[in-house]
Amino acid sequence: MTDIATDAPRAHARIIYLGPVSPHWEVYGEYGERTVLEEFRTRVLARLVLLTRDDPQFRRNRERIVRDAERERISIEWDLGYAESD
């Protein structure tokens, strides 16, 4: 057992890879406060704007985005255009 309380997410965002031609990414807010989602979207796009999903920097920035979402209590869903294996 852990003493960590898991709070419900404040918002949900989908991060979608659009393809190899810029812009590569789009972020859609599914639910939650609009300002929270807009600020999160701005940070996500700043990290991904010039990266394709195959760029080595993408993996590091993806982990940073996941940590940011956890801090902000935003659940995220990635659509990279292929099935991911964990």
Annotate the PLM regions.
Residues 31-33:
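Solvent-exposed strand-loop boundary residues in beta-sheet-rich modules
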